[in-house]
Amino acid sequence: MTEIQKPYDLKGRSLLKESDFTKAEFEGLIDFAITLKEYKKNGIKHHYLSGKNIALLFEKNSTRTRAAFTVASIDLGAHPEFLGKNDIQLGKKESVEDTAKVLGRMFDGIEFRGFSQQAVEDLAKFSGVPVWNGLTDDWHPTQMLADFMTIKENFGYLEGINLTYVGDGRNNIAHSLMVAGAMLGVNVRICTPKSLNPKEAYVDIAKEKASQYGGSVMITDNIAEAVENTDAIYTDVWVSMGEESEFEQRINLLKDYQVNQQMFDLTGKDSTIFLHCLPAFHDTNTLYGQEIYEKYGLAEMEVTDQIFRSEHSKVFDQAENRMHTIKAVMAATLGS
């Protein structure tokens, strides 16, 4: 029988943004997640968090994040408690500080998915327990662990990988890919119209990490330059939650940046993989997709159905890996 290893040790730490961790710590979490994935595949129990209680705070809805934290908690022997936007009063009827102090006395760890980065920072500051950022408008660190785990599973390494993000350069995925990638020695290319370039503050953090750890950061609106010899092409939705009024403007800006076969041909290699944090608008098989088609005549948006369903696509491995990497973070910061 396989011997259960002790959890990777980051006891008491919070994961609020990628730069909270060193390269070695981030890689350690990825490797630990790969081990936990094998445990689950082989039916090996790994109850590192028996008796623990986990609060799952959701201001923003999510399929993958909620499912991943819930299953990860149960697999680790913990009890997850979901608190949706109608259950919590962060900054409305009760301050984040007061909420944090209450939850910290009842729960052993807190996940937060919402809008404000300051909110998740304050939860960590005042709760006295580990807090994990499930997504804010600024950063998406748990997604990054899954993304780079997926890349490592496909190529066997991270340092020196070329990763191209195509789309809105101002969103949290672009921010996090730049910083996490640079920290892991990855060459990150953000391909976006100039008007959607990431803010300099985020680029500066990424470039600092690149100089420290050996990665690189490129910001360009030239698609051919961005995807040449790239190992992975990553995209995200063109319009995020709360931005629905900007659909027409965003479509006009990004229609030439759709991930399609022509873009993959420009890579010059057959081994390039496709990544997407999901949900993806690649067909009209949703009410949302039908509405976009009726309004704008687009049956596909950020990625074509051909690429989404192709052998290049690793999006469902990536989605599964949310659970394994979140499990690694929880076990590392709470386990003993």
From Swiss-Prot:
The keyword Metal-binding does not apply. GO terms for biological process: arginine biosynthetic process via ornithine; arginine catabolic process to ornithine; citrulline biosynthetic process; L-arginine biosynthetic process. InterPro entries: Asp/Orn_carbamoyltranf_P-bd, Asp/Orn_carbamoylTrfase, Asp/Orn_carbamoylTrfase_sf, Asp_carbamoyltransf_Asp/Orn-bd, Orn/put_carbamltrans, OTCase_ArgI. L-ornithine binds at N172, D236, S240, M241. It catalyses: carbamoyl phosphate + L-ornithine = L-citrulline + phosphate + H(+). It is an enzyme of class 2 (transferase). Carbamoyl phosphate binds at S62, T63, R64, T65, Q89, R113, H140, P141, T142, Q143, C277, L278, R322. One of its GO terms (cellular component) is cytoplasm. One of its GO terms (molecular function) is ornithine carbamoyltransferase activity. Pathway: Amino-acid degradation; L-arginine degradation via ADI pathway; carbamoyl phosphate from L-arginine: step 2/2. Its EC number is 2.1.3.3. Keywords: Arginine metabolism, Cytoplasm, Transferase. It holds the Pfam family OTCace. Gene3D superfamilies: Aspartate/ornithine carbamoyltransferase. It is found in: Cytoplasm. Reversibly catalyzes the transfer of the carbamoyl group from carbamoyl phosphate (CP) to the N(epsilon) atom of ornithine (ORN) to produce L-citrulline. PANTHER family: ORNITHINE CARBAMOYLTRANSFERASE, CATABOLIC, ORNITHINE CARBAMOYLTRANSFERASE, MITOCHONDRIAL. Belongs to the aspartate/ornithine carbamoyltransferase superfamily. OTCase family. This is Ornithine carbamoyltransferase, catabolic. It comes from Staphylococcus aureus (strain COL). The lineage of its organism: Bacteria, Bacillati, Bacillota, Bacilli, Bacillales.
